[in-house]
Amino acid sequence: DFNEVAEADWVVEAVVERIDIKHNIYNKIQTTRKNNSIISSNTSTIPLKILSANMSDEMKKNFCITHFFNPVRYMALLEIVTEEFNDIEKINLLKQFCDEKLGKGVIICNDTPGFIGNRIGVYAMQVAMTEAFKMKISIEEADAVFGRPMGIPKTGIFGLYDLIGIDLMADVLKSFIKELPKEDPFHEVAQEIPLVTKLIETGYTGRKGKGGFYRMNKSDGKKVLEAINLETGEYHPSQKINLGFGDKIDINKLIQRKDKYGEYAKSILTKVIRYAAYLIPDVSSKYIDIDDA
């Protein structure tokens, strides 16, 4: 209802991630909004400069990206992406409102691919996956390490891939490969993995497909969770991995271990921390913003 747009102080666009559809919406908003109202997009992938390309100067300075993380009710992080053309006073007002009224942890990001959260998050996921292949870590072992011990959902890395969709993650990687400069270390962990390509081609795209790195099968009439062998591509009954920490897992003790679990954890953390430092000042001028994200 564009009559409501005419009265609103802040309009948030959250339509499908297609630039043609978004531009069409912005054209309609531009003819109905009141001057000085704030307009923002909830995009997680499209650069601000592209989104605002057809806007008037007045609308452009009041337009930004407000990237809410899902589920919005429970995830505190909010990335506000700005450009040089933005009205800084308006951005600060929006940040204050989202902090005080919406209870969000607001981070101001530069207009770069993936912003902060997804740029580092996807890199970390790719590191965890590629290191598992390289170090011959099973997917159950990888998920036990790159899961709760590192503040990741209990799905772990491979379970998270299945949840998101292996094919969707492949599209995300293609987007990063296209947008990021060739010297960016992201490219080192974004190369095509034959097993992943085969899973997608055969319909094993994750939970929404026939299965993925994990799948449900039946044995003697009972459902059995199976895990894929990264070397052979064959499935076997999933094994429960005990890291030997009990209820409380100390990440410092984990990375100091001399076994394969400790080496795997240390390898991931080292690469992710180095990459995060590499991104300053490209994604943000403040190290604390990366820590907060």
Predicted region positions:
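N-terminal glycine-rich phosphate-binding loop for ADP-containing cofactors
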Residues: 1-293
